[in-house]
Amino acid sequence: MPKSTNSVASKARRKRILNKAKGYWGSRGNVLTVVKHAVDKAEQYAYRDRRVKKRTFRSLWIMRINAAARQNGVSYSRLMDAIHKKNIEIDRKALAEIAVKDPEAFAMIVKSALD
């Protein structure tokens, strides 16, 4: 009896892996054994960096709030302390957006937090 192989599934599996490596340079994009390692590593980086992205954006928002707060004569830590003590419900993302897009409104928030 001849050896039977499920070539349809094998080709589909290889094609799926090769499609994930589209745009990779050299053998990383067309040699299956190298592609497997490249795709695995890319997925590891993607998994890790989805978590790092949250930290990166939070630090960006803090930098923007700090810069705008210092233009209004107060440090970031004192501003956030005042906002929490006054129970002003605004998150850092929204506060950073206001600081960049509407400095007058940000100045009003600073004034109301410090008064």
Curated annotation (Swiss-Prot):
Q: Which InterPro entries match?
A: Ribosomal_bL20, RIBOSOMAL_L20_CS, Ribosomal_protein_bL20_C
A Pfam family hit: Ribosomal_L20
Q: Which residues form the signal peptide?
A: none
Q: A single GO BP annotation from the record?
A: translation
Query: Among the entry's GO cellular component annotations, what is one?
Result: ribosome
Q: Which UniProt keywords apply?
A: Ribonucleoprotein, Ribosomal protein, RNA-binding, rRNA-binding
Q: Which NCBIfam families match?
A: rplT_bact
- What function is annotated for this protein? Binds directly to 23S ribosomal RNA and is necessary for the in vitro assembly process of the 50S ribosomal subunit. It is not involved in the protein synthesizing functions of that subunit.
Report the protein name in the record. Answer: Large ribosomal subunit protein bL20
